[in-house]
Amino acid sequence: EAEEAARLQAEAEEAARQQAEAEEAARLQAEAEEAARLQAEAEEAARLQAEAE
């Protein structure tokens, strides 16, 4: 019984670790999308600047 409880505890900890990794991956994905958006805005600003000159 104690061994089963310990095994279930270890499985729960592994599941929590995987959940945390998935949340970190989602956060990094969102940061990458924001960086891409800012890059596109910078390129658009540079294009408008070139047109204005």
Swiss-Prot record:
Designated name of the protein: Membrane antigen containing repeating peptides
Keywords associated with the record: Membrane, Repeat
Region annotation (Disordered) ranges: 1-53
The organism of origin for this protein: Leishmania major
Keyword Transferase carried by entry: no
Residue span of region 6 X 10 AA tandem repeats: 1-53
Parts of the chain that traverse the membrane: none
Principal subcellular localization: membrane
Keyword Coiled coil belongs to the record: no
The organism's place on the tree of life at top rank: Eukaryota
Each Sequence repeat, start to end: 1-10, 11-20, 21-30, 31-40, 41-50, 51-53
An annotated GO cellular component: membrane
Subcellular location: Membrane
